[in-house]
Amino acid sequence: MVSARVIVQAPSHLGLRAAGVQGLPEALLAAGFAERVGARRGTRLAPPAFDPAIDAGTGLLNPHGLRVYASRLADAVGAVLDEGAFPIVLGGDCTILLGITLALRRRGRSGLLFCDGHADFYQPEAEPTGEAASMELALVTGRGPDLVTDLEGRGPLLRDEDVVVFGFRDADHAAAEGSQPLAPTIHAMDLWSIRERGAELAARDALTYLERTGGPAAFWVHLDVDVLDDAIMPAVDYHLPDGLTWEELTGVLRTAVASDHATGLDITIFNPTLDPDGRVARSLVDALVAGLTP
């Protein structure tokens, strides 16, 4: 991994009906995140205006805004990559992954270590709320309306076989809600398989897969903080029991970013309006710092 780190702020909730996650960058930066991980503060990208109406043509909230924002975020992330630096993108909701993977796709083939409590594989016909933040993995692998899956004619942005879904625990809930199942061509490691193996060893297994001969040249790390145990991460909008501990998260991050193939990291879904005293933000920053520093 390169030593220089640059923070890109992407405070968008275009893919999520509830507001609050757009305050994530300010909350983590106020808790000292940039200074403690030795990162330079770079671009902050304000999102387009939020439209609460579901688009009739796509079944999504804000599809045109998502497309515009993805292009702008791809430019910002790409500029950091072109410096030879390591972008750390602070969301926002998980739809920022559209812009991130567009930046990667412009540069070739990339993998994704997708650390999330939810598989986020809903497609519009199964998601009546229109929230693309429950669909982003489907979208970046080419499932959904062309408006947001075939960005710049480059879709799908990721190949199924170049994705590891790590730490999800919503399979039963998602199936009951009518979500499409994860494609069998996507490498899936749910919370229970990770616990059986041990978080750090499971992370090494994930990297072995992503770094395989004939695989992608590099990979990105996506961190939705709801991969953490709900008991220690209450500042999220959609709750599930169980999840990773702080120590497990630290071990996973330390393993991932130590790889020469890791090109960047994004952090999403933390909602500081649900953390009025800042206690959870401070604990999150402590864990991130422990995972991102030698």
Annotate each predicted stretch with a short phrase.
Residues 114-117, 141, 162-170, 190-192, ...:
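Short, structured patches in soluble enzyme cores that scaffold and shape functional sites
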Residues 82-150, 160, 259:
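Active-site histidine-anchored catalytic micro-motif
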Residues 8, 92, 115-117, 166, ...:
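Active-site flanking residues adjacent to catalytic metal/cofactor-binding acidic residues
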Residues 166-173, 245-250:
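A general structural motif
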Residues 171-183:
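Short, glycine/polar-rich helix-capping loops at beta-to-alpha or helix-loop-helix junctions
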Residues 2-88, 100, 106, 184-294:
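Catalytic cores of soluble, metal-dependent hydrolases
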Residues 122, 172-174, 272-274:
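Active-site environment of divalent metal-dependent phosphoester hydrolases
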Residues 119, 170, 225-229:
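Short, glycine/acidic-enriched loop or turn micro-motifs at the edges of active sites
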